[in-house]
Amino acid sequence: MSEGGSKDSSGSECPVCYEKFRDLDGASRTLSCGHVFCHDCLVKYLLSTRVDGQVQRTIVCPICRYVTFLSKKSSRWPSMLDKSSQTLTVPVGLPSTPSPDRGGHTNPLVISHQVWRQSSSQGSQVPLDLLPSLPRESQIFIISRHGMPLGEQDSVLPRRSLAEISEASPAPSATRSFCCRSRALLLITLIAVVAVVAAILPWVLLVRKQA
């Protein structure tokens, strides 16, 4: 738990979409840093930060840049989950592209709300043009209480094996050794060529004089 957990971050509205939590039944979700957002804004963030179609298991708080870890939970009936629990229901296969701001930058949490509407049955928002193609089973993620500062994000990213790293980029000592061997081989070859020329040249000149 970071220092942000001690802040008064349980405000009455989502700091992203400014929707009142009292108008969104059970929609507030608290990250490990203590900042509170609505369910739909966090889902949009996860959709916009997918890598190769896979939802990431982390959320970076846009306020304090603290990383919150997520754990995946499978459920065939996501609508039956407790709305007050720290869960995020992420639809499978929904394309989502953040809209750039005036400076040309994109904020993953700031996505157009024009294509989203309030669902009367679940109290959550779904895209209007994607309702017919929604899968029956969604991905359920649980917001954990564990996190870390963004400066340590290198431990969050997937790591390659040591074999892949060494194969992709040789060690500096091996590179220097190879360069030294190449230079020594080139120098020996040059000395050998000069010695051969020095040995043959007098005989060539002598033959020309006799001729």
UniProtKB/Swiss-Prot annotation:
<keyword id="KW-0479">Metal-binding</keyword>
<dbReference type="Pfam" id="PF13445">
    <property type="entry name" value="zf-RING_UBOX"/>
</dbReference>
<keyword id="KW-0863">Zinc-finger</keyword>
<keyword id="KW-0472">Membrane</keyword>
<dbReference type="InterPro" id="IPR013083">
    <property type="entry name" value="Znf_RING/FYVE/PHD"/>
</dbReference>
<keyword id="KW-0812">Transmembrane</keyword>
<keyword id="KW-0862">Zinc</keyword>
<keyword id="KW-1133">Transmembrane helix</keyword>
<dbReference type="InterPro" id="IPR001841">
    <property type="entry name" value="Znf_RING"/>
</dbReference>
<dbReference type="GO" id="GO:0016020">
    <property type="term" value="C:membrane"/>
</dbReference>
<dbReference type="GO" id="GO:0008270">
    <property type="term" value="F:zinc ion binding"/>
</dbReference>
<dbReference type="InterPro" id="IPR027370">
    <property type="entry name" value="Znf-RING_euk"/>
</dbReference>
<dbReference type="InterPro" id="IPR042973">
    <property type="entry name" value="RNF222"/>
</dbReference>
<feature type="transmembrane region" description="Helical">
    <location>
        <begin position="187"/>
        <end position="207"/>
    </location>
</feature>
<dbReference type="InterPro" id="IPR017907">
    <property type="entry name" value="Znf_RING_CS"/>
</dbReference>
<protein>
    <recommendedName>
        <fullName>RING finger protein 222</fullName>
    </recommendedName>
</protein>
<feature type="zinc finger region" description="RING-type">
    <location>
        <begin position="14"/>
        <end position="65"/>
    </location>
</feature>
